[in-house]
Amino acid sequence: MLTLHDIIYLEPRRHRSPSLYQEMGWHYRRLIVPRILKKCRKIITVSRFECERISKALQIPADRITAIYNGYSTHFSPLPEVDMHIVQQYIPEKGFLFFLGNTDPKKNTERVLKAYSLYLQRSATKRPLLIADLKEEYIDRVLQQEGIADIKRHLYYPGYIPNSHLATLYNASFAFLYPSLRESFGIPLLEAMACGTPVVTGNTSAMPEVAGSGALTVDPSKPEEIADRLLQLEQNPTLYQEQKAYGPQRAQQFSWAQTAGELSKVYQSIKI
């Protein structure tokens, strides 16, 4: 039995990861996983999308693969009041745009920053963007590469943000950006929806499967679409309130208790 969260490392890629840790992990999994899979009687993964990818890429019969969704921690929920002491450790005021950054190309950081520059050109509000988990050197390189260095004054990039502060920041933000190029599931997507934060996410891979109607989807390869969605949320109060309501409703369909129950059934079904 093997739990396999994704097979991204077996798919073609355009760029090497700038992180040595990520690059070594990519090569290790690419070498080891196909060998292990040959001996597995059952494979568990985290979405129907990933089931199909595994079956197709590795020529494994679909009935040997089971999709069991992830859950999320229950402290992610709408808060009656936002703790501004936590918020102001990262950004002066609430009502910002929030993005969990990463140097992994699939996280689409370059296009998110390009989309944000397009948003700033058209928005009357010009909300600042809080970026987690990225160093200034990397951000500067992307801004120079995209020719948008002038937007830096609107960015906040405190580096690492502990998990214990994320629920407060989701609640304090105007919208959460999660337009990845590829996700096998996407737990941050659930976390933000559970907090009642409107989400802009990708229309590819497992993201629409997880989001349902609880998030707005875009083609993540098109920065102008990402910017358009942000502006729609800003300019259409009805749409904004609908998304705030849809998110928690959708997130309630996922839980770690449900995940554990389904895992238990699969393990019990295997005869030794």
Task: Tell where the protein language model's regions lie, with residue ranges.
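Carbohydrate transferase catalytic cores enriched for Leloir-type hexosyltransferases
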Residues: 1-272
